[in-house]
Amino acid sequence: MSSTENNGTAVPLQEFEYKAEMKQLLDLIIHSLYTHPEIYLRELISNASDALSKARFNALTDQDMLDKDAELAIRLTLNAEEKSVVIEDSGIGMTEEELIANLGTVAKSGTLGFMQSLKEQQQQLDGNLIGQFGVGFYSVFMVTEEVTVETRSFHSNAQGYRWRSSGQGTYTIEQIDKATRGTRISFKLKEEHQEFAEEYRVEQIIKKYSNFVDFPIYLGERQLNSMTALWQRPKSELKDEEVNEFYKFVASDFNDPLDYLSISVEGMVSFKALLFLPKEAPPELMYRQSELENRGPQLYVKKVLIQNECRDLLPEYLRFIAGVVDTEDLSLNVSREMVQSSPVMAKIRQILTGKILGWFEMLAKEQPEKFKTFYKAFGPIIKIGLNTDFTNREKLIELLRFESTKTEEGEFVTLREYVERMGSEQKEIYYHSGNNRAQLLAHPNIEYFREHGIEVLLLSDPVDMFVIPSIHEFDKKPLKSIEKADCDFSQQSSNKAEPVAPNLLNPVLQAFKEALSNEVEDVVESRRLVSSPVTLVSGKDAIDSQLERMMKMMNTPMPPAKRILEVNSSHPIVRNIAGMIMADANNPLIKTVARQLYEGALFLEGSLEDATSYVTRMNELIEAATLTR
């Protein structure tokens, strides 16, 4: 055992052995659990910040505290040529016993077993089983072969100590003369990690992970962190300019946010948050589900960034929300890279979801134009929640907005507004689905409703067909697609044209059935058509044609359902066909016209697959028509 000189007295250099499980633990940390070497700096800064917080607290009551008036700060010294790094704080420091307890032993029994399990399963751990083990310090061995820690406790008569280890099985402790309170960590970087001695790289890491810690972080005389954690301040103290700049920083957006929400919660769980609504949705958010799965606000613990995009903070349909959530209540796993599935996390998520939905409701009532901008950008994503978040389903339904036959293009109506202006005789909420507003308004199925002034919701968002049918009813009024054959058509039509007599119409219907026996379920007289000769509708229990088309586009086709062809008995074409049958029931033109009308109905709704045959047949009919003149 060697010795050192301290105040003229020989003090032995003490060597200690790590326990077997500590050695295995170090190996796991260095080689398995930390996926990014830069994390080491975040961990050391976080530990320094904790030590400074304790020093600040003790200064309130301990009048004899060592260096009571010293600035509470973290100082970095880099030497790129020597590949060395020094991290020093003026925090609470450590005694010899604390050095052994904090740096020489496992923080909690059973740690190694949990760590090995984490490595094998690569999954989050239950917050009830694993706490904060405090082993983040050892991440420094990812970037160095040996680390030296010099420390002196805050007690006025405290002795200084030097702790040194290569992480290989032993560590040493010796007494030293250290004039100031706090801890100094120094080491030389491995060859492959010398980038961490470059000022630009260290500044980059500090701004990414530790920009908002409570204490200044100096590199030389230059402060690297802003320390301005806006989410910690009351909303009344926030200025739009600084909020906008902060949003651009956390969201990597060049635009100002559409709106923001400041949250402060105290109770069973405590946290603060500053959340933002972007003005626009990135295109990839609409077309790639994985984009939503991997998004979320930033998660901080004690102002230290733990997870840049924390998907566990919000349900999937709200993950377009940017911002920061900061709590001191959350249990973390050892590497701080994954948040544990804990009751605390679940509670934070529940509270955040409720407050965000309340925020949307407030915008809808108090700032409708701002809400409309938000809904146009993120409405399709919000609708996803109807099929996933059953707890908040009613709130989400109230947020839904639709264009309708009574709104201008780009304007919306809510389900509640729709119900309030329904006629007393109307029992159902009607909707029509398709590719765009113009197509929907031109569709034959809507003619009856427009003639009688019955409002129809126009669903042109692809998401609608997956979520709207699941609502079933609103305010005790069933939602009904106007494509269904069993809609209520009890109001008298103002169409003055005389319908074809039943004895003449029945042969027409029969001729259509024979011509289209393989394509349609039935051919019936229509009560909905006003100006079109035919239309296609679905049976009571059949799926909508729009949903069927979308399933095909997604390569998940459903068994094709036969449709019902409705025929307008007052239309001139139908009257002419009746005359053709009376003249010659075997006229081949009858079947040709029947098929052309059927495929024309398919064309109008976007379901026609063989456009070539349709156009060829149309040309033949035009040729026949022109020959008779």
UniProtKB/Swiss-Prot annotation:
One Pfam family named in its UniProt record: HSP90
Region described as B: 337-549
Cited SMART domains: HATPase_c (SM00387)
Protein name, entry field: Chaperone protein HtpG
Subunit structure: Homodimer.
PANTHER family recorded: HEAT SHOCK PROTEIN 90 FAMILY MEMBER
Keywords of the record: ATP-binding, Chaperone, Cytoplasm, Nucleotide-binding, Stress response
